[in-house]
Amino acid sequence: MTQDDVFVTPHYADHRRAAGFLNEMVRSIEAQTDPHWRLIIVDDKSPDPSAVERLRAIQARDPQRIQCIFMPEHVGQGVCRNVGVNWAKRIGAAFVLFNDADDVSYPDRLERVRSEFERDPDVGLVYSTFEVIDEDGVQVERHRLGEPIRQILDAQSANAPRGYDAWKRIGTETGYANLTSTTAVRTAVAIEYPFFCMTAEDSNAWYRMSGGGVKFSYVEAPLAKYRIPTDIKGSQDRARVGESYYFGKMIAEIAGFFAATDMATGRGEIDSQEARQLEKDFFLRLSRTLRAEGAHSLADRVSSRASDGVELAQNVRKARS
C-alpha cells in the first residue's frame, strides 16, 4: 500500500496578492496525479487578519489531507518548515516536498519524486529545474530574468550538481542550485538537518545535508513554477528585509559551507589541505554571486580581503560550537 507523503508550506500573508497565490498553490497540490499526498500549511503569524479564516476554509475543503498550523509568533519560514517536517514525521511520511505559498507544483511532481526515491534508495534529496512565472501565472521570458535566476538555470542545464558531494560544486562553482519549491527530502534527513537561519536558510541546510553524506538526485524536467512578481525587486524575503538580506545570505552560506567541509573532513572524505582550497574557491565564487546580485561592497570584502572571509568563517565556527 502506497503511503501518503507531505507537501510542506510556510505561509506569511503580508501583501494583497497572497490569497490568490495561496489558492493557486493549493490547487496545484490537489491536482497531483499521485493521490497519496498530504499538505501541511504553517502560518507564520501573518499580519493579514483574514489569513486565519482563509486557511481554515482551505483545510475544510479536504480535512483528511490538508492541515494548518498557526504559529503564536513570527519565527521565519525555516522554522515553519521544521514544524511541518515534524508533523510529517508523526504521520509516518517517508519524504517531504517543500512548496512555498506563492509557488506552484506541476501535476506530476509527487509521482516523479516518488519514482526517484524508489529508483535509488540511497538518494536523500531530489530536486528539479523549474519554470519562472509572474504574478499572473504567465511564464517570464529569459531576458526578463535577473542574473541570479539565470545563473541557476544555466548551471542546471550545463551540469546540475548531484551525487554524494554536490556541496563542493554548489559552493565553489554554481552557487545556489536547487530552489526550495523544487526540492524534496527524505523525512529522516530533514529531521537531522533542520533549517536554522532567517535568511538563506534553505541554502544553509542543503550544504549541511550534502556535507553530511546525503546523496542528491536531479530531475531535468521542470516540476515546479517559481513565482517572481514583476513589481517586486528580488524575492519576497529580499523585499521584506532589504539590504540586510545580502549580509545574512553571506553569513548563512559561509556557515553552511564550512559545516559541510567540517563534516566531510571528519568522515575522512577530504583532508585539511583540500578543505582549505575548497574554502578559498568558495569565497571567490561567493564574491561573484554577491556582485551579480548588486551587493558590491560585500563582494569586494570577500574577494579582495581574504582575511575578512577567514575571520567571518572563524566567527561562524565559534558561534556554532
What are the language-model segments listed below?
Residues 71-91:
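Glycine-rich, basic loop-to-helix element that forms the pyrophosphate-binding segment
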Residues 49, 103-116:
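Acidic donor-binding/catalytic loop of UDP-sugar-dependent glycosyltransferases
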Residues 43-54, 73:
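A conserved acidic beta->alpha catalytic loop
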Residues 153-240:
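Conserved nucleotide-sugar donor-binding catalytic segment
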Residues 214, 222-230, 235-268, 303-308:
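Catalytic core of nucleotide-sugar-dependent glycosyltransferases
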Residues 24-36:
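Short, acidic, metal-binding catalytic loop of nucleotide-sugar glycosyltransferases
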Residues 110-149:
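Conserved donor NDP-sugar-binding/catalytic core segment of glycosyltransferases
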Residues 93-104:
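Short beta-strand-to-loop acidic/aromatic patch adjacent to the donor-nucleotide binding site
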